[in-house]
Design a protein with these regions (language model features):
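Extracellular/periplasmic, surface-exposed regions of secreted and cell-surface proteins
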Residues: 148, 152, 174, 193, ...
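C-terminal extracellular loops and terminal segments
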Residues: 157-161, 740-747, 787-808, 853, ...
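Aromatic-residue-lined binding/catalytic grooves and analogous aromatic/hydrophobic interfacial grooves
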Residues: 202, 869, 1019
């Protein structure tokens, strides 16, 4: 280095003597000097990274902050790295608190990393407050907003599929659709939806939220966490906290993505020639005349005709800033999604704004607002594309019309393109949502906090539908043109408004006693909740002569024939008044106690004397790892044993006033001369003065543990829930009025497990996580012995004591009759006259005959097990995330190809039909007149198990040192693939099939769940 400096001195002296003034040469010299100076300042820094016990940390990361330059420690915890004095070194290790140190004049930098206390002291939102997760005795899953962002989902809940134990999420491929969520099974015959709480306000859905505006999401599943929500907590609670500013400089974030959606799993149907082969055989079996195929020689794939590759985009911008006294957040989003059926489109505009003001050291006020405008898609069905024959052409070019289907189909099925093209955009709908709160918070007497919050949510939905005149080409009619349906236009219209108003008044006391041995947080509160809905419906048809114009500006019920007008309305309101209390206590940080109480009064039961009900929970925990006898176990960081018990409530019933029934239309009477018709009315259902809430008794026991410097986390829990006093409607007998009573009990029980491993080896970081849930659902009692609730289009779903809710009911198939001798040797079938080739039903009750009494449970739609896997890998600026999920042990009932006297296209599996002795023992003969083959049986049951690569995301984050030159704080680009591949067993588009509480898991031609490919960019400045 001394020689280099001497050479530099001689060069300068030489230049001065020659007095060279050339600008280019001086520039070159300056560059040389700068380069030499930088070279002179670069040096090697060494050191050792250890833990608090002075043990070396192997594979700890040592990174030059703001760059991708770095190294890792060796087997002795030692490292060596080239740096400059201005550099800052960042030291990190999984489960440890990171440190940053400026190099300066140091040549040796030894670092001791401490255990990350945040791993043990994670704070979660629990409703009416927050708490350290280690102090809680229940099961709460925290989802960070980052896990929801950058995903092509209109509803943030869709992205949680497979990521949370105990939570089953069923997604639909329809544009803008909401997922179905069941937490720890189906708890009631009256509903399964959890309670959503958005910034403190109780809600029924969160489709108006932008995923980019969510800070965190907590999913509460256990009685210890849920009892404080009383009558609303029975089906679980999902708490959403939207983003607020953090103290620091003003930042602007822009996140935009775009991509496309594609149907990748089509239903396997026969082609044109195969259809003719099977249909000819069917006509022969039915002893019908052969069909004349003249003009019917197409080979149409109707699925290809109706489906499209759809466009999707999400765009968001947010501005955030904070000072010690004031913080604000403003986020605006725009989303647009096309459906995979042509002409379907959904769009949403959202706004999220919050302001918080710290007026004094003890007084804080603020507000939160969420708004949305949604234009729902005019969704179409895929059913006709599955049923229409492939021999029919799509379009007749000579007439310029779509083609009617052949005689054997057109009475039941339209050309699928009629709905897709000729009835496209005939429904116009707009949904508006405004939700928000204002609050004030006062700290006083050192340990007390009082918070008052007023919240309101207003939803306004309106829609109009137009029925056009549809003409098609039909060679079978004179003139070649026929009109579908009534041949008259029609309009219908609805308007619906819903209001929710809530007020909360909470007093919280927090203190520690006896040198921190006793730690207490106590909360008491008073809340009110009001909910009302008003809806008007109307319709008019075309009058004599005048056609209602095909113009959205004319689609109102003021147009059309007044004599054809129909109308209807719905209106109800409901209110709840509550007091609540909760205690979170620990002794010496290792003996935990949680207790909560809530007393609810509901207007729904105000005429019964049972309007008030108490709910409570008790929970205990033991942090064994804090005991002295556990301290020497170096690999154990945390071990907690926990258990809780509680009671919850449910008032969900589709009747607005279950205790005070409304009137409904009844028989009319004629009196007088001239005769006058007097309409009659009757009670919709009999009042029950003893009607009361549904009550859930729940308990769970489990453990949580962190091992190996908090790199490994594992938790497991056993849970059990009994819903008693089920609100059930008892049908009237022989035309009498039905009644409502508390007449049943449902039980759900199972096991939840979740495990995560995180580690970092130098520039490489990785994480692996998995979760698994088992569930057993059983109806313990219902009304009376032998009573069943029957649901579903094919009356295939039964709810009955001793069986799972919504189980599939029908005959078990023992094969296919191969011959008359086979029929004679089998139990006598009293249901119908059978022939060889018909389905052979099992004699379940063993009486020697096939009768309706042989029907039994043939499938359970509730999965026995659901599971999920996640893999994350980071290398320098690159990150890769893969989410997988699946379920098993459930069945699907296929209904879309099961109707008497209707001729549909054939599933590909029907090529293996019975057509002679020994040809098949699984597929019956082709004959729609043999109705026995259409009876509900396990011939229509399919395996609902599946495994799916749910999400794959690859991202690159640019070095801050590089992007700072263009004044950016952060820049990330990413690609995302959703629903990359599904391995399934059923014949339909998707094994994900939702439904109602008592009829789900039924494939009635369900909409496909597409693969979604997107590219995005996220930048902050």
């Amino acid at each position: 280095m001394e020689k280099f400096n001497a050479m530099r001195t001689r060069l300068l002296q030489h230049l001065q003597k020659k007095a060279i003034r050339s600008k280019s040469i001086m520039t070159l010299v300056c560059l040389l000097l700068a380069s030499a100076s930088a070279f002179a300042q670069t040096k090697t820094v060494t050191g050792t990274v250890t833990d608090a016990a002075n043990e070396p940390l192997i594979g700890a990361s040592v990174l030059v902050q703001g760059t991708s330059t770095g190294t890792i420690t060796d087997m002795d915890g030692k490292y060596s790295i080239s740096v400059t004095p201005e550099d800052v070194l960042a030291f990190s290790y999984v489960g440890m608190t990171s440190q940053t140190i400026k190099v300066g004049t140091q040549n040796v930098i030894n670092v001791t990393l401490k255990e990350d206390s945040q791993v043990l002291a994670e704070t979660v939102v629990i409703g009416y407050g927050s708490a350290k997760k280690r102090d809680l005795t229940g099961s709460i899953t925290n989802i960070k907003g980052e896990e929801l962002a950058n995903k092509p989902a209109m509803n943030p809940l869709s992205s949680l599929q497979g990521k949370v134990a105990g939570v089953q999420i069923v997604n639909s491929g329809r544009a803008g659709s909401d997922p179905e969520i069941r937490i720890r099974g189906t708890n009631s015959i009256n509903g399964y939806k959890p309670l959503y709480i958005v910034d403190g306000l109780f809600n029924d859905n969160i489709n108006f939220l932008n995923p980019e505006d969510i800070e965190s999401m907590e999913i509460l599943k256990d009685p210890s966490s849920l009892a404080i929500f009383g009558v609303r907590g029975a089906n679980g609670v999902i708490i959403i906290t939207t983003k607020k500013a953090k103290e620091g400089q003003t930042l602007v974030n822009i996140n935009t993505s775009f991509g496309f959606k594609k149907v990748v799993d089509k239903v396997k149907l026969v082609n044109g020639s195969q259809f003719k082969e099977l249909y000819n055989e069917q006509l022969a079996n039915q002893k019908d005349d052969p069909f004349d195929y003249a003009g019917w020689d197409a080979n149409t794939d109707w699925q290809d005709e109706i489906f499209q590759t759809a466009f999707i985009t999400n765009n968001n911008i947010s501005i955030t800033g904070a000072s010690p006294k004031h913080s604000f957040y403003l986020g605006v989003g725009y989303s647009y999604e096309q459906g995979n059926i042509e002409h379907e489109k959904f769009s949403k505009v959202t706004i999220n704004a919050s302001n918080d003001y710290k007026i004094t050291d003890f007084l804080k006020v603020g507000f939160q607002f969420n708004g949305a405008r949604m234009l729902p898609a005019d969704s179409k069905q895929v059913l006709n594309a599955l049923r229409a024959t492939p021999i029919a052409p799509v379009y007749n070019n000579e007439y310029g019309l779509y083609t009617a289907l052949p005689e054997f189909q057109k009475a039941q099925i339209n050309n699928p393109m009629v709905d897709v093209e000729l009835k496209a955009n005939t429904t116009k709908a707009e949904n508006y949502r405004a939700s928000g709160n204002i609050y004030g918070e006062v700290d006083f007497l050192k340990h007390f906090t009082f918070k008052a919050m007023f919240s309101m949510d207003y939803a306004s939905n309106n829609g109009r539908t137009y029925t056009p005149i549809v003409k098609v080409y039909d060679a079978a009619v004179n003139g070649g043109i026929s009109t579908l349906g009534t041949g008259k236009t029609e309009v219908s219209q609805f308007k619906e408004n819903e209001t929710k108003v809530q007020s909360d008044y909470l007093l919280t006391y927090t203190n520690s006693f006896d040198n921190g041995n006793h730690n207490l947080t106590a909360t008491a509160g008073f809340t009110t909740y009001y909910n009302s809905l008003s809806r008007l419906d109307g319709a008019r048809k075309q009058g004599v002569g005048l056609v209602i114009p095909d113009n959205p500006d004319k689609w109102f019920v003021s147009i059309g024939d007044a004599a054809t007008a129909t109308n209807g309305s719905t209106q109800w309101e409901r209110s709840t008044l509550s007091v609540l209390a909760r205690v979170i206590y620990n002794y010496k940080g290792k003996y935990l106690f949680n207790g909560s109480f809530r007393r609810d009064g509901s207007s729904a039961f105000s005429y019964t004397g049972n309007e008030w009900q108490n709910f409570f929970s008790l929970g205990g925990g033991w942090l064994m790892s804090e005991e002295e006898f556990m301290k020497d176990i170096k690999w154990l960081d945390m071990l907690k044993i926990k258990a809780s018990y509680g009671t919850l409530g449910n008032q969900n019933l589709d009747k607005a006033y279950p205790a005070e029934p409304l009137l409904t239309n009844a028989y009319s009477a004629v009196f007088g001369k001239p005769s006058i018709i007097y309409p009659g009315y009757q009670l919709a259902y009999l009042p029950n003065p003893n009607l009361r809430w549904e009550k859930v008794e729940a308990w769970e026991a489990g453990f949580e543990t962190n091992l190996l410097r908090n790199r490994w986390h594992f938790e497991g829990v056993y849970y059990k829930k009994n819903t008693k006093d089920l609100l059930a409607e008892v049908p009237g007998i022989s035309g009498t009025i039905p009644g409502i009573g508390n007449l049943g009990e449902i039980q759900n029980k199972g096991v939840e497990m979740a495990v995560t491993w995180r580690d970092q080896i130098g520039d490489w970081g990785y994480s692996v996580s998995a979760n698994l849930t088992t569930i057993k659902n059983e109806v313990k009692s219902l009304v009376q012995e032998g009573y069943s609730i029957i649901a579903g289009d094919k009356q295939q779903s039964y709810t009955m004591a001793g069986y799972p809710i919504g189980y599939f009911y029908g005959y078990k198939v023992a094969g296919v009759y191969q011959s008359q001798a086979d029929i004679d040797a089998s139990p006598k079938n009293t249901l119908a006259t059978v022939t060889p080739g018909d389905l052979k039903f099992a004699d379940v009750n063993g009486d020697g005959e096939i009768t309706p009494e042989d029907r039994t449970m043939i499938g359970n739609p509730t999965p026995k097990v659901t599971y999920g896997f996640s893999l994350g890998v980071d290398y320098k600026n690159w990150s890769l995330g893969i989410d997988m999920m699946g379920q098993g042990g459930n069945k699907i009932f296929r209904t879309w190809d099961n109707y008497n006297f209707a001729q549909f296209n054939y599933l590909e599996q029907r090529l293996d039909r019975w057509h002679g002795e020994g040809t098949s023992n699984t597929q019956p003969l082709l004959n729609t007149k043999h109705s026995i083959n259409n009876l509900n049986s396990d011939y229509y049951i399919e395996n609902g198990s599946f495994f799916r690569i749910r999400n794959v995301q690859l991202a690159y984050t640019f070095d801050k040192s590089l992007i700072s030159k263009i004044r950016l704080q952060a820049l990330k680009v990413y690609v995302n693939i959703q629903n990359l591949k599904t391995w399934k067993h059923n014949t339909g588009y998707t094994p994900e099939l939702g439904g109602t509480a008592t009829a789900f898991g039924v494939d009635n031609g369900s909409y496909p769940v597409p693969a979604v490919y997107t590219f995005g960019i996220n930048l902050t400045f």
